[in-house]
UniProtKB/Swiss-Prot annotation:
One of its GO terms (molecular function) is 2-methoxy-6-polyprenyl-1,4-benzoquinol methyltransferase activity. NCBIfam families: MenG_MenH_UbiE, PRK00216.1-1, PRK00216.1-3, PRK00216.1-5. It comes from Francisella philomiragia subsp. philomiragia (strain ATCC 25017 / CCUG 19701 / FSC 153 / O#319-036). It catalyses: a 2-demethylmenaquinol + S-adenosyl-L-methionine = a menaquinol + S-adenosyl-L-homocysteine + H(+); a 2-methoxy-6-(all-trans-polyprenyl)benzene-1,4-diol + S-adenosyl-L-methionine = a 5-methoxy-2-methyl-3-(all-trans-polyprenyl)benzene-1,4-diol + S-adenosyl-L-homocysteine + H(+). This is Ubiquinone/menaquinone biosynthesis C-methyltransferase UbiE. Pfam families: Ubie_methyltran.
Length: 250
């Protein structure tokens, strides 16, 4: 089937392959200004713990080059700037210009200058040299990518041998009772919060649906192996609501 005839998921809706990127862009242009506030409200602040645990697993050191992909408003990039020091470099990359602008303003106001670059880029075709980064992170962004396999292969290409990729993403709860509560919260509370805070219930309806369409823990693990990563492992967080996958390039 040619790409012109292919379809893919946008939440629970099937859309033409080339249309998903535009629709996802619309979501994040809409929510960028209130993105951080909504993250705190939706997760009761727990997203900060998930990200802190992710950063602790990166192994980032002084002088490293780090790519924070789909980095949005820069929660991880800010910490990486401190970790790599003046001799290192952090690239905060996002496909969405609104998110990137919010991230740049936020990090500049926090004094993160000199060792950070901002690059608008598509994860499926990263504009960086082969074997360039010591570490790549993508936090709550992979599920929005149209061609996830292509994006993972692109990440593998730009990662140095010996480097690691960390994928922090919503996943499949492993506790049945938690799964039921989570479904109720996702499909009812999230759109309601979105309507009250951002005047955009539909974007948060998409959020809940996109989580359900994202590959589960074992499927994503295999996708990372298929993309060229080795020693792939994952850690469930908060009962599997979120999972952190780590893969290495040798």
């Amino acid at each position: 089937m040619s790409k012109e005839n292919k379809t893919t998921d946008f939440g629970f809706t099937e859309v033409p392959w080339e249309e998903k990127q535009k629709k996802v862009a619309g979501v994040f242009h809409s929510v960028a200004a209130k993105y951080d506030l909504m993250n705190d409200l939706m997760s009761f602040g727990i997203h900060r713990i998930w990200k802190k645990q992710t950063i602790a697993k990166t192994g980032v050191r002084k002088g490293d080059k780090v790519l924070d992909l789909a980095g949005g408003t820069g929660d991880l990039a800010y910490k990486f700037c401190q970790m790599v020091g003046s001799q290192g470099k952090v690239v905060l990359s996002d496909i969405n210009s609104s998110m990137l602008e919010v991230g740049k303003e936020k990090l500049t106001n926090k004094g993160c200058v000199g060792n950070i670059e901002y690059v608008q880029a598509n994860a499926e075709c990263l504009p960086f040299p082969d074997n360039y980064f010591d570490c790549i992170t993508i936090s709550f962004g992979l599920r929005n990518v149209t061609d996830k396999a292509k994006a993972l292969a692109s990440m593998c290409r730009v990662l140095k041998p010996g480097g690691r990729l960390l994928v922090l993403e919503f996943s499949k709860p492993i506790v049945p009772m938690l799964s039921k509560v989570y479904d109720e919260y996702s499909f009812k509370a999230l759109p309601f919060l979105g309507k009250i805070i951002t005047q955009d219930a539909e974007s948060y309806k998409y959020l809940a649906e996109s989580i359900r369409k994202h590959p589960d823990q074992e499927t994503l693990k295999q996708m990372m192996y298929d993309a060229g990563f080795d020693n792939v492992e994952y850690q469930n967080m908060t009962g599997g609501i979120v999972a952190l996958h780590i893969g290495y390039k040798y």
